[in-house]
């Protein structure tokens, strides 16, 4: 079974979101990293880039596949996880500790479209 954290929000495209004071911390779920296999590269936006809910903001590459990252919220990228540039495999070791980007949310109502832990577990059949 995949690890799913209570208190986070989840997208249908397997990104998780943690909200801290108007900032969305975004990463990929345990389910996603297991499906991808060993992650070898993370493509991330630059700080201060604008991102939009439902649109691509980067990609993960693994030995098995490449997968677009879809942003669950709109806003301005305020931080990227630079550790992932040299060590993308950190996502495999702990996808919830190793976030990808932080976004200053421009429309908090977009969070309503995301799933809670129970709904996400049902979506992935766990």
Residue spans of the language-model regions?
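Structured functional modules or segments
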Residues: 44-96, 105
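Acidic, low-complexity mobile loops and tails
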Residues: 1-56, 93-126
């Amino acid at each position: 079974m995949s690890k799913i954290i209570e208190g986070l929000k989840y997208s249908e495209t397997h990104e998780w979101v943690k909200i801290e004071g108007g900032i969305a911390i975004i990463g990929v779920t345990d389910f996603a990293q297991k499906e991808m296999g060993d992650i070898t590269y993370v493509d991330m936006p630059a700080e201060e880039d604008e991102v939009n809910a439902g649109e691509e903001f980067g990609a993960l590459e693994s030995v098995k596949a490449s997968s677009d990252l879809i942003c669950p919220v709109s806003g301005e990228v305020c931080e990227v996880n630079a550790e992932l540039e040299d060590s993308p495999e950190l996502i495999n070791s702990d996808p919830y500790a190793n976030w990808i980007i932080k976004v200053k949310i421009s429309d908090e109502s977009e969070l309503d479209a995301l799933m809670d832990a129970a709904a996400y577990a049902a979506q992935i059949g766990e």
